[in-house]
């Protein structure tokens, strides 16, 4: 296989490594910044859900609260259509304020994975490790909240909603957000990375030309090439993108996720979230302890 072809089907084929960074630092190479910038793309948030909990009742992990979105041309605000409120819109800012005013709103849960661990239909992470990849994020800044909403919507976007118009509007928002990212805003950068991977991958799997081919999750690109839209694909190919880990590999008991706790409609980019292993891990993680990993526990944050 030629290097050119390999690069086309594997966006990470020529990505930097820690060894390259150490070597560059040793030599005083000016490329260190570029290498570091490339390395941060190897960790991405996935499967964003809104978390709500009322005392005495089971928690709720929701991915379906936003059913449509667009950018208003005059105000340039992100407008949302909420589940059950078709025909009316509210701004993302208004929705953020309403969420933050509700004691039941706990924030967003998300998994931090590598692009190669995202195997299309399952996650290539053992349950014993998967629970340590979960983070609870409760953004109070509109930009950060917007990134969470965008990723959650794109991950659960149906073919009908995945239009060129939507993609252009979201890309414009992300381009503007990228200008606000500084080294101090680590969670914003992480969420921007996630939204960028998700946007380009959704474009790829819905037969649109991605804005950045190098930011299409590699397994989704390969799965599209190998599996296409065929309904009778060879079992060995199905296994590549559907073989995960059994819960028996977990060292601690996993509490089954009750019916209705995770609200998720299967879409192009959220198949792993709909699996029993991931749902049970998410529920067990939430109910096992009151202390959840937050941005402060995964990053060294600066004042």
Curated annotation (Swiss-Prot):
The keyword DNA-binding does not apply. It comes from the Viruses. The keyword Nucleus does not apply. Pfam families: Herpes_UL7. Keywords: Host cytoplasm, Host Golgi apparatus, Virion, Virion tegument. It is found in: Virion; Virion tegument; Host cytoplasm; Host Golgi apparatus. One of its GO terms (cellular component) is viral tegument. Plays a critical role in cytoplasmic virus egress. Participates in the final step of tegumentation and envelope acquisition within the host cytoplasm. Belongs to the herpesviridae cytoplasmic envelopment protein 1 family. This is Cytoplasmic envelopment protein 1. The lineage of its organism: Viruses, Duplodnaviria, Heunggongvirae, Peploviricota, Herviviricetes.
């Amino acid at each position: 296989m030629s290097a050119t072809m390999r690069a086309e089907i594997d966006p990470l084929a020529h990505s930097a490594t820690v060894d390259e960074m150490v070597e560059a630092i040793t030599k005083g190479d000016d490329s260190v910044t570029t290498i570091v910038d490339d390395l941060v793309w190897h960790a991405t948030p996935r499967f964003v859900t809104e978390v709500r909990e009322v005392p005495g009742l089971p928690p709720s992990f929701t991915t379906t609260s936003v059913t449509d979105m667009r950018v208003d041309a005059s105000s340039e605000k992100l407008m949302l259509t909420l589940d059950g409120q078709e025909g009316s819109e509210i701004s993302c800012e208004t929705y953020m304020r309403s969420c933050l005013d509700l004691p039941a709103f706990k924030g967003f849960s998300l998994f931090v994975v590598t692009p190669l661990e995202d195997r299309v239909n399952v996650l290539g992470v053992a349950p014993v490790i998967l629970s340590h990849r979960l983070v609870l994020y409760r953004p109070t800044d509109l930009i950060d909240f917007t990134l969470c909403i965008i990723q959650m919507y794109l991950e659960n976007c149906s073919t009908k909603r995945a239009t060129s118009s939507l993609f252009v509007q979201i890309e414009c928002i992300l381009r503007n957000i990228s200008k606000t990212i500084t080294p101090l805003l680590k969670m914003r950068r992480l969420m921007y990375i996630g939204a960028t991977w998700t946007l380009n991958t959704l474009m790829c799997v819905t037969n649109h030309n991605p804005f950045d081919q190098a930011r299409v999750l590699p397994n989704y690109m390969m799965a599209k090439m190998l599996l296409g839209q065929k309904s009778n694909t060879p079992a060995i190919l199905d296994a590549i993108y559907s073989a995960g880990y059994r819960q028996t590999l977990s060292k601690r008991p996993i509490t089954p996720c009750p019916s209705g706790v995770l609200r998720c409609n299967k879409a192009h980019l959220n198949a792993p979230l709909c699996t029993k292993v991931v749902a049970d891990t998410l529920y067990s993680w939430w109910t096992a302890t009151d202390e959840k990993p937050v941005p402060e526990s995964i990053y060294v944050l600066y004042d």
